[in-house]
């Protein structure tokens, strides 16, 4: 079973994080071990918009998964071939557990990235992390990134 924590980075900090994703990962992996979100996480991340995520799940994933259930505040999506996704909400993150094919992860990431471009995921305990929707670099963004390093 694969486990992810997914955060929505505040738009005002996105430009400062680009190129420093390793530092963000180091912070977020520490947050996973705390029952309450760290102060730094509350500062850098938006509160998860549950309606936005619910819409992404129902509108986009409801078409390809056999069952989409909501019980005890947790989404459970089941596909007969790919497997099962469990999604739990906390104020600043989503906790996702995928049991089955890696296609489950891809389906969820595509749905969330279509809903908003600022989602950043870490794979708990595996050292994998990244933007769900890759950031497009313009020349101006690259020049600013060099200045802020």
Question: Which residues does each PLM region occupy?
Answer:
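A common structural junction motif
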Residues: 112-119
